[in-house]
A protein has these predicted regions:
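Active-site-proximal alpha-helix that buttresses catalytic centers in soluble enzyme cores
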Residues: 1-236
Length: 236
């Protein structure tokens, strides 16, 4: 487990507290304390909004969280997104990754990385293929949905030579991005909430960086992947 994976959520909670939009703001986690099932104990408000800080409506958000919070039973396929618990109202929101603003967020990241790392020269978007990298899992088909939606929305804008999905655990795999297109210039945007294990370690290694080098770079405070890196005749 990468300890940095919870940092963005904790920072977001601090920012929301500073804005005074809600009476209370608290965090709960799957693998860290406080746990998801402790949500009601963490605040005293009568109405509690529970927002998954995840990208897609997948196995975790549609089965694990609802079950732990009592919105659904283990064998229940559907559930209501609000419930009463000891005279308090719990409202289960949809993941932040499904919000309409995510398209502009992804495009902003894609443009920024090219501007920051133009060597040997900044390629035109019309000669660049953009990959949106997600997790993917056979446990729940919705895990792909957020990535596929963004791929189509960005493709419709016609800025890039092509826009393609890539996944950790499903086809098309991240490691196959170099053979997925004839274009030389590639940009890959990890569609993950945090710079955790997948974004910082798994993806660089899947793209061809040796594990020892990735670990060494991270230990010294460097990015695991150096932009741009040439691999298999492509510049990513």
């Amino acid at each position: 487990v990468n300890e940095q994976s919870s940092a963005p959520t904790r920072r977001l909670a601090q920012d929301l507290r500073a804005r005074n939009l809600f009476a209370e703001v608290a965090c709960a986690f799957n693998l860290e304390e406080p746990k998801i099932e402790d949500v009601v104990k963490l605040v005293s408000a009568q109405r509690i909004f529970i927002v998954p800080i995840t990208i897609s409506e997948g196995y975790f958000t549609e089965q694990i969280i609802p079950h732990r919070l009592g919105f659904s039973s283990a064998d229940q396929s559907g559930y209501k997104r609000f419930k009463l618990c000891a005279n308090r109202t719990l409202i289960y929101c949809r993941p932040i990754g499904t919000h309409a603003s995510m398209t502009d967020v992804l495009l902003s990241h894609a443009r920024a990385v090219v501007v920051k790392h133009p060597f040997p020269h900044a390629p035109e978007t019309a000669e660049t293929v953009l990959f949106i990298a997600g997790h993917g899992t056979k446990k729940n088909a919705n895990s792909r949905k957020a990535v596929e939606v963004q791929v189509e929305l960005i493709r419709e804008r016609g800025e890039y030579a092509d826009v393609l999905p890539a996944y950790l655990e499903e086809e098309p795999f991240i490691a196959d991005c170099f053979i997925a297109t004839k274009e030389m210039y590639l940009v890959m945007i990890p569609f993950f909430v945090a710079d955790g294990l997948h974004a910082m370690e798994d993806i660089p290694m899947l793209l061809g960086e040796p594990k020892t080098l990735v670990k060494k770079r991270l230990a010294s405070g460097q990015p695991a992947w150096r932009n741009p890196t040439e691999h298999k005749g492509k510049l990513l």
